[in-house]
């Protein structure tokens, strides 16, 4: 039976904009199971990244519940969030956020304590085995982003969250990056949510949602 990895229930989030209270997320529900790759699209400022931050336990909702692997984590003390994020969630950001003084493979082996042979296997799967001993400054933008993708999949995390992973890449490299995410989601039976403006990569996901007026609507 396929396990539900993430469930967002009746999520609300508002911000104060001067004298006005602006509702960003309005009664949002979302469920993602293992092996599913979901995309969220919509204009800038519509709440996509806010929703991703709530799903990733980086931000608390004003109302609603976040369930991760069946547990209502929104009810847990905040000091437990860091441990859960580290163990259960992998992040892929717009900016790869690689440390310049660590080689590509060391971004996983040093920071995540991943065994060298496991790093080599993952890099081989992603077609970047040849750059494992290169520093980030020597890599192209596409190569740096692929290392960031490898880093997200190097742990036992069941949930992968990608925030505009193609933003700094050209069309071809952007599509390749998302193809790699898709491949690893299905191969490793992860659940993944990608926020993107790049509609050229939407054919690679299993489900698409559009954020409009604070609500999430299936496409």
What are these regions (language model features)?
Residues 160-163:
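Catalytic Walker B motif of ABC-type/P-loop ATPase nucleotide-binding domains
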Residues 135-139, 143-145:
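Conserved ABC ATPase signature
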Residues 73-90:
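ABC ATPase NBD coupling module
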Residues 72, 116-131:
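Conserved ABC ATPase "signature" region
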Residues 154-158:
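A short, proline-enriched helix->beta-strand linker immediately N-terminal to the Walker B motif
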Residues 56:
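Helix-to-loop junction immediately C-terminal to a conserved catalytic motif
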Residues 64-72:
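Conserved ABC transporter NBD signature motif
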């Amino acid at each position: 039976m396929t396990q539900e990895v993430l469930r967002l229930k009746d999520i609300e989030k508002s911000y104060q904009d001067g004298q006005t209270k602006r509702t960003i997320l309005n009664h949002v529900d979302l469920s993602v199971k293992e092996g599913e790759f979901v995309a969220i699209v919509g204009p800038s400022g519509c709440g996509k990244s806010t929703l991703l931050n709530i799903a990733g336990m980086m931000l608390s909702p004003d109302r609603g519940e976040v369930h991760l692997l069946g547990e209502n984590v929104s009810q847990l003390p905040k000091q437990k969030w860091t441990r859960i994020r580290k163990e259960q969630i992998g992040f892929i950001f717009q900016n790869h956020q690689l440390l310049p003084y660590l080689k590509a493979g060391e971004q996983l082996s040093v920071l995540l304590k991943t065994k060298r042979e496991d790093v080599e296997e993952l890099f081989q799967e992603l077609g970047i085995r040849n750059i494992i001993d290169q520093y980030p400054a020597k890599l192209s933008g596409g190569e740096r982003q692929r290392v960031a993708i490898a880093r997200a999949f190097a742990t036992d995390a069941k949930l992968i969250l990608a925030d505009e992973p193609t933003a700094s890449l050209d069309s071809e490299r952007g599509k390749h990056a998302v193809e790699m995410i898709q491949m690893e989601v299905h191969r490793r039976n992860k659940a993944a949510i990608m926020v993107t403006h790049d509609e050229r990569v939407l054919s690679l996901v299993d489900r698409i949602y559009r954020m409009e007026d604070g609500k999430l609507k299936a496409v």
